[in-house]
Regions:
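Short, Lys/Arg-enriched N-terminal segments with co-localized hydrophobic residues
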Residues: 25-35
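An N-cap/entry alpha-helix motif that binds or orients negatively charged groups
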Residues: 36-97
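Alpha/beta enzyme core
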Residues: 77-301
Length: 301
């Protein structure tokens, strides 16, 4: 975590001692967590990830293959088929035609899961991210097109407002702060629209409290009982997000503002376990730690 400018680990501690003590502590935390979590029907439906062959492949335990790989794809409403992202050489924003060609190439390589992230034109952004609720936006069009052309592909859709807001935050601003409960209502609307457009998996990345339960409730009430929720359960306020924010076009809107009031403090491991346990109880089928590489202790826990 020194890459996150961490200064909370005393230099006199040896790496070996930290690793040894952490291993025992993590095991204890894990066993406590298992007994803490209470998964109940209908928020939890264990058949959900068994409902389709490609979902069973994605969540198969003790089996490592291309079925475990998910390819992020950035899309934009643009005339050019591909536009390279400056901060990520070799990675492109695609229009719909290029998206379909890229997906076909991935299928030929054995990769059957794609995660769609939009770059939205500045003139379509506003305070509440209203374009996220337009059923003709680029994400909804992409999901429908992928479902028609590649029914065997798992389509993962990001649930968050930051690509659509003119301030770059993941929710509604009230007196300069992101209002949690107003944002939940908008995330419900966005999630339902994405499910109606053909998303197999919804991935809320916003880090609002209670978002998983809110999304699960709206899905259940509209008979989308098999739509999987992949929660960004432990999403840290990380320095690593710069290239991604450039890719979706939110960095200019966010400017020097911080997301630390809703994304997690990188010093906290116990909090990650609480966040994960809560999301599972609220109805998440899959959970994620983000970033991953620099947070392997959190993944291990």
């Amino acid at each position: 975590r020194t890459l996150e400018k961490s200064k909370f680990v005393p230099k006199k501690w040896s790496a070996c001692k930290i690793q040894e003590n952490s291993s025992v502590s993590i095991k204890r935390r894990y066993h406590r967590l298992i007994f803490m979590i209470k998964r109940t029907y209908p928020h939890t439906r264990l058949r959900r990830t068994r409902s389709k062959g490609y979902l069973r492949d994605l969540v198969a335990e003790n089996n490592l293959s291309t079925n475990d790989l998910i390819q992020p794809i950035f899309i934009a409403d643009q005339s050019d088929k591909q536009i390279e992202i400056p901060s990520m050489p070799g990675i492109f924003r695609h229009n719909l035609d290029s998206l379909y060609a890229e997906t076909e190439a991935l299928i030929n390589k054995g990769i059957k899961s794609v995660a769609i992230f939009p770059a939205i034109d500045a003139n379509k952004k506003d305070q509440k991210g209203s374009h996220a609720f337009d059923d003709k936006n680029i994400v909804c069009s992409a999901l429908k097109g992928l479902a028609d052309r590649f029914p065997e592909v798992i389509k993962i859709a990001d649930v968050a407002l930051d690509p659509y807001t003119d301030h770059g935050h993941d929710g509604v601003l009230l007196d300069g702060h992101v209002d949690n409960d107003q944002t939940l209502e908008l995330l419900q609307d966005q999630a339902l629209l994405l499910a109606q457009s053909g998303a197999d998996i919804l991935a809320p990345s916003d880090m609002m409290d209670g978002r998983v339960r809110a999304i699960r409730d709206i899905l259940e009430s509209h008979a989308f009982v098999d739509t999987v929720i992949l929660s960004y359960a432990a999403k840290y306020a990380s320095s690593f997000y710069g290239p991604f924010r450039e890719a979706v076009g939110s960095s200019a809107n966010l400017g020097k503002a911080s997301k630390k009031t809703y994304q997690m403090n990188f010093a906290n491991l116990n909090e990650a376990l609480h966040e994960t346990a809560m999301d599972i109880e609220e109805g998440a089928d899959i959970v994620m730690v983000k970033p991953g590489t620099a947070y392997l202790d959190v993944v291990h826990a």
